[in-house]
Amino acid sequence: MEGNGPAAVHYQPASPPRDACVYSSCYCEENIWKLCEYIKNHDQYPLEECYAVFISNERKMIPIWKQQARPGDGPVIWDYHVVLLHVSSGGQNFIYDLDTVLPFPCLFDTYVEDAFKSDDDIHPQFRRKFRVIRADSYLKNFASDRSHMKDSSGNWREPPPPYPCIETGDSKMNLNDFISMDPKVGWGAVYTLSEFTHRFGSKNC
């Protein structure tokens, strides 16, 4: 795995190397769905240890640092982003972000410090919230017809993934229920950055 300090030395990644993962630019929700699928099929870790994490807020304006889309010290302002969280039985949790310049996977505490920094220095309208969904629930319930990636003329803003759209027996498109940070909507639990860090950071492992 990519270097990430002594705590990561004995950790065996739940995924293939970054460049071997299923990846389509600007389709982070599907990239993480495919990563959950890989973990389920390869059975190296219990799927129950893994979570899809949607990051957004009411305004759909969230700064994330250390993104490939913005080399250097500045953040990217996404409308939403999706990463995978592995709550490892080894005592350290890891974040898998296919769009970061940080290690893949990255120690949770390192990722939070470098990619999210602190809400204290961020205007309230940009503060991030986190919807954390168990990977098995994400695989079962997520659906996207990719319509959000088409412009008003029906043209793709970014080329779609080469595989068929992900759908369920009940839905062809429920992406907004995952992006929403209303705890009454959708699946999983919604956290502030402070709550997310306290829940999954190393001090509470």
Swiss-Prot record:
Q: Which GO terms describe its molecular function?
A: protein-N-terminal asparagine amidohydrolase activity; protein-N-terminal glutamine amidohydrolase activity
* Secretion signal span: none
UniProt-listed Enzyme Commission number(s): 3.5.1.122
User: Which key words tag this protein in UniProt?
Assistant: Cytoplasm, Hydrolase, Nucleus
Where are the active-site residues found?
C28, H81, D97
Q: Where in the cell is it found?
A: Cytoplasm, Cytosol; Nucleus
Regarding protein family, the annotation reads: Belongs to the NTAQ1 family.
Could you tell me what this protein is called?
Protein N-terminal glutamine amidohydrolase
